[in-house]
């Protein structure tokens, strides 16, 4: 993991030195000297590692690690110096001009002090650089250097890849179904060359599965020529061609050309084309990292009429999804199910007999170990092999309690570690930081997309790209980590976008170990041992900390934290906050904290504050001093009003104050807004405003906040209509708009709204006297929710042709007896029909809503039978009937009922009902 280590040292410093505040403030002379020397050091360290710093000798390894550790510590010092400088600059510039002369001496003193500190850092950098050069030229060091070699992890993994061709049967679990599917694709009758990509995270069994297929008799009989080529991460295309030629000739039992190693690129291509031109061949390219390989190699693999196939394994979804040609496809590897994982582990841990497991009472702890592997075949097999030598329950329990240590130190688990490090080292530097930051969260924690993105932005992990919003860049980072199988998507929203992620247990263990080694992240949990944990935090200075158990005032003594997360419901005291002046992100979501200390406002660098789902009732009075704050999330907290002076937080981008009214006794006031503070409309950079009471000043000036993309207002009154529409028409980037009237009889006057082209999600709660004329202009709309509209006319005609509509929710939206869906709604996947008290019939014409997957019918008591035409919805997966009439339910209950044949194609049908004993549901599926 040398590249990662260099990145976290010198790479971090170079990134920090791009800070624009510094460059604008007249101290860039020291910076230029730093950057030049650091670039030389970076090249030296990378070259040293390449020639022997990867573990070839103890001397080179220790020197390498020492130099990098020193530069990493300097990086942290520079970050702190810059933050301190930013504090002084802001204090000076924010003064009224009349007071600047008074504060000028203090500002100049601060600037001089910072320049001195940077000068001292420069001296330290020069000292480290001189030490490197001195040791590099020493005789002992030169003797220790070896000729250039490939990365140790990569070489080890390549050997394992080759050995997969000689798999043992007890390693093959859970492959029958995917094997049959893939062989069927390889043997398909299409004459053109087809590429089949097998994609999955490192250690998921891609290579084992592919090797089993490659060696199968059906494949051997079908193809004339075969080649298995393991692709080095730093491959040379000529070497790939030579390996391929050797494989083809060896499989054909033919003499390998004597001149092979003297041939150049063109001759190698010609020889391959000549050999394969009239043959049906299969090539397996194992462990492909980039699409660039295909661009280079495809010219040598003839696309003839004989049905040749290319199979490749990759960890990267971008590689698997590349357009390789007509008929090409990808197969995503699924992790092993619980029973399959147990079989594989048992085969390795108890090769003689499972009886040993039972007689020695090992099964409970063994199953816990298997559970930690979360279906990852490589981890299961490696751990099973290691445990096969351990006979006593105490030994097994020790391994379970120290699994993180075992992964990083036990030689028998080296392959697991090496494969994961290969994926990690391949990440660009910004993605390395973002990935390791995810190890802050507890194992199996559900990490939400927006939360991650905003925390990354607060830490300045997101590299600026001209013309692209930081949110979009961060989103691309997240997608890239998913494509590379470093994060797993565990929740998608109905619109096909990832909503929540998790990190595989094994990857999390390794990521956390790297984070601790790099003094980047640390966790304070049940594995932390009181004084030792405190000493670790104080002495090693990790920048980001997650507290996962109850903390005492003296349990954390670090002062240089940039992130503090509390992921525990235990009681916490905030005595440590006064010492955390460098904090950039404070996340207390779902913690037991009920009061914030006044010292919070001294955290000048704070950019992200998450108080959602806490018991906090108010923010400090001087909250406006947090001038760098970008995100404030008080969702589902007890905060009803923001403090005065909020308008001074000019950098604020996300203001999220949505609250549920837990004690409401009606179907209307279930959402509570936050009371608006004066001048809040002066927050010109605000992008998210969710959710606020509609008050006259805000409504009239809302149009000043032209960067808003998400707006949620409650307590809207009829007289707001014209001003509200005028303001909204000035905002051209709205993607989410939610308007709720003050009560269910108060009309929403929104006919004059015209700036609707950008809206993707629209929720209107309030009486509509007519269908807005602009409904049919919502060409980008994916969600439409109408609640309490009480329309006398059918709105369906105005929205049925909207091309991107995925989710439609009607809640007491229509007063007529008949709801008819004609041709249209071609992309609709979710339909909700709720509380239509006059509704007696729903008709779905043939061809309408062809893609519908979920249908909810709730509290429509007048509806006595399922929608006519429901039998035509062949993609419908779920039908939910909630508090509907007994007549409707009985018509589809059980075989032989009147309408049973119309719903028999639906996999899941559920009926929800209430009795005096509570709420229940039953399945009506066949």
Swiss-Prot record:
Effect of residue 781 to F: Loss of function
Effect seen on changing residue 340 to K: Loss of function
Leucine-zipper: annotated segments: 10-45
Annotated consequence of substituting residue 852 to F: Loss of function
Impact when changing residue 247 to K: Loss of function
UniProt effect for mutating residue 924 to F: Loss of function
Topological type in the membrane: Peripheral membrane protein
Consequence the record notes for mutating residue 464 to L: Loss of function
Compartments where located: Endomembrane system; Cell membrane
Pfam families, sorted: LRR_14, NB-ARC, Rx_N, WH_DRP
Result after altering residue 186 to F: Loss of function
GO cellular component: endomembrane system; extrinsic component of cytoplasmic side of plasma membrane; plasma membrane
Record note on what altering residue 307 to E does: Loss of function
GO function terms (MF aspect): ADP binding; ATP binding; nucleotide binding
Effect of residue 272 to F: Loss of function
LRR repeats: 561-580, 581-603, 605-625, 626-649, 686-707, 708-731, 756-777, 778-804, 825-836, 837-859, 876-900
Domain NB-ARC: from-to ranges: 153-467
Primary role: Disease resistance (R) protein that specifically recognizes the AvrRpm1 type III effector avirulence protein from Pseudomonas syringae. Resistance proteins guard the plant against pathogens that contain an appropriate avirulence protein via an indirect interaction with this avirulence protein. That triggers a defense system including the hypersensitive response (HR), which restricts the pathogen growth. Acts via its interaction with RIN4, and probably triggers the plant resistance when RIN4 is phosphorylated by AvrRpm1. It is then degraded at the onset of the hypersensitive response.
Name used for this protein in its record: Disease resistance protein RPM1
């Amino acid at each position: 993991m040398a590249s990662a280590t260099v990145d976290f040292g010198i790479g971090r410093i170079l990134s920090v030195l791009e800070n624009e505040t510094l460059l604008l403030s007249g101290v860039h002379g020291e910076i230029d000297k730093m950057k030049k020397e650091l670039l030389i050091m970076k090249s030296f360290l990378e070259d040293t590692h390449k020639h022997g710093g990867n573990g070839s000798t103890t001397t080179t390894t220790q020197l390498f690690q020492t130099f990098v550790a020193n530069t990493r510590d300097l990086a942290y010092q520079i970050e702190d110096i810059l933050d301190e400088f930013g504090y002084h600059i802001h204090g000076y510039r924010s003064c009224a001009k009349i007071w600047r002369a008074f504060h000028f001496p203090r500002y100049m003193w601060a600037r001089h002090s910072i320049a001195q500190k940077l000068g001292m850092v420069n001296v330290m950098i020069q000292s480290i650089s001189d030490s490197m050069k001195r040791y590099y030229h020493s005789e002992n060091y030169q003797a220790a250097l070896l000729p250039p070699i490939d990365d140790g992890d990569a070489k080890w993994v390549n050997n394992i890849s080759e050995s997969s061709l000689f798999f043992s049967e007890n390693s093959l679990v859970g492959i029958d179904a995917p094997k049959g599917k893939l062989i069927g694709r390889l043997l398909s009758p299409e004459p053109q060359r087809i590429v089949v990509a097998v994609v999955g995270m490192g250690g998921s069994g891609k290579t084992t599965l592919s090797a089993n297929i490659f060696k199968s008799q059906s494949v051997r009989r079908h193809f004339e020529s075969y080649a298995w080529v393991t692709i080095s991460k730093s491959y040379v295309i000529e070497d790939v061609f030579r390996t391929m030629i050797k494989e083809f000739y060896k499989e054909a039992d033919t003499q390998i050309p004597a001149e092979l190693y003297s041939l150049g690129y063109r001759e190698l291509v010609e020889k391959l084309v000549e050999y394969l031109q009239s043959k049906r061949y299969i090539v397996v390219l194992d462990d492909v990292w980039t699409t660039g390989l295909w661009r280079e190699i495809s010219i040598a693999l003839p696309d003839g009429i004989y049905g040749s196939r290319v199979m490749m394994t990759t960890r990267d979804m971008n590689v698997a999804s590349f357009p390789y040609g007509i008929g090409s496809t990808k197969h995503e590897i699924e992790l092993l199910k619980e029973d399959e994982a147990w079989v594989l582990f048992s085969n390795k841990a108890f090769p003689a007999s499972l009886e040993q497991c039972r007689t020695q009472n090992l099964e409970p702890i063994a199953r816990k170990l298997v559970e930690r592997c979360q279906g990852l075949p490589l981890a299961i097999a490696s751990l099973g092999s290691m445990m096969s030598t351990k006979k006593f329950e105490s030994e097994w329990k020790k391994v379970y309690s120290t699994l993180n240590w075992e992964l990083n130190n036990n030689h028998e688990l080296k392959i697991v570690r090496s494969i994961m490090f290969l994926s990690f080292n391949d990440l660009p530097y910004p993605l390395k930081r973002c990935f390791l930051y995810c190890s802050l969260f507890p194992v199996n924690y559900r990490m939400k997309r927006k939360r991650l993105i905003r925390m990354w932005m607060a830490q300045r992990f997101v590299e600026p790209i001209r013309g692209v919003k930081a949110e979009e860049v961060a989103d691309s980072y997240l997608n890239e980590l998913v494509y590379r199988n470093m994060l797993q998507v565990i929740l998608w929203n109905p619109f096909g976008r990832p909503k929540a992620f998790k990190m595989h247990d094994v990857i999390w263990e390794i990521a956390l170990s790297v984070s601790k080694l790099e003094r980047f992240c640390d966790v304070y949990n049940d594995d932390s041992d009181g004084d030792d944990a405190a000493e670790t935090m104080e002495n090693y200075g990790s920048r980001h900390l997650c507290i996962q158990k109850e903390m005492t005032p003296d349990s954390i003594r670090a002062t240089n934290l940039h992130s503090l997360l509390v992921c525990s419901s235990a009681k916490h005291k905030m005595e440590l906050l006064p010492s955390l002046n460098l904090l950039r992100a404070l996340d207390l979501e779902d913690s037991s904290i009920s009061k914030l200390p006044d010292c919070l406002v001294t955290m000048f660098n704070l950019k992200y504050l998450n108080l959602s789902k806490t018991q906090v009732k108010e923010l400090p009075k001087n909250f406006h001093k947090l001038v760098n704050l970008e995100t404030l999330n008080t969702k589902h907290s007890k905060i009803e009003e923001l403090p005065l002076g909020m308008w001074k937080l000019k950098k604020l981008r996300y203001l999220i104050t949505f609250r549920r009214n837990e004690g409401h006794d009606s179907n209307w006031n279930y959402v509570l807004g936050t009371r608006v503070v004066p001048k809040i409309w002066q927050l010109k950079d605000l992008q998210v405003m969710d959710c606020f009471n509609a008050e006259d000043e805000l409504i009239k000036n809302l149009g000043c906040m032209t960067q808003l993309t998400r707006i949620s207002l409650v307590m809207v009154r009829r007289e707001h209509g014209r001003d509200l529409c005028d303001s909204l028409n000035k905002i051209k980037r709205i993607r989410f708009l939610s308007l709720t009237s003050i009560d269910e009889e108060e009309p929403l006057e929104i006919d004059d709204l015209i700036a609707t082209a950008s809206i993707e999600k629209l929720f209107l709660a309030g009486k509509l006297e007519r269908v807005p004329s602009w409904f049919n202009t919502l060409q980008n709309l994916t969600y439409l929710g109408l609640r309490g509209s009480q329309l006398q006319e059918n709105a369906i005609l105005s929205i049925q042709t909207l091309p991107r509509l995925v989710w439609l929710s009607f809640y007491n939206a229509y007063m007529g007896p008949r709801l008819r869906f004609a041709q249209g709604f071609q992309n609709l996947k979710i339909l909700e029909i709720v509380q239509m008290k006059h509704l007696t019939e729903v008709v779905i014409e043939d061809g309408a809503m062809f893609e519908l997957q979920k249908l909810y019918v709730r509290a429509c008591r007048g509806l006595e039978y399922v929608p006519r035409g429901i039998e035509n919805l062949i993609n419908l997966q779920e039908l939910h009937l909630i508090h509907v009439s007994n007549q409707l339910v009985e018509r589809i209950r059980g075989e032989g009922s009147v309408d049973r044949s119309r719903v028999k194609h639906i996999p899941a049908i559920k009926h929800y009902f209430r009795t005096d004993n509570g709420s229940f549901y039953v399945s009506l599926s066949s």
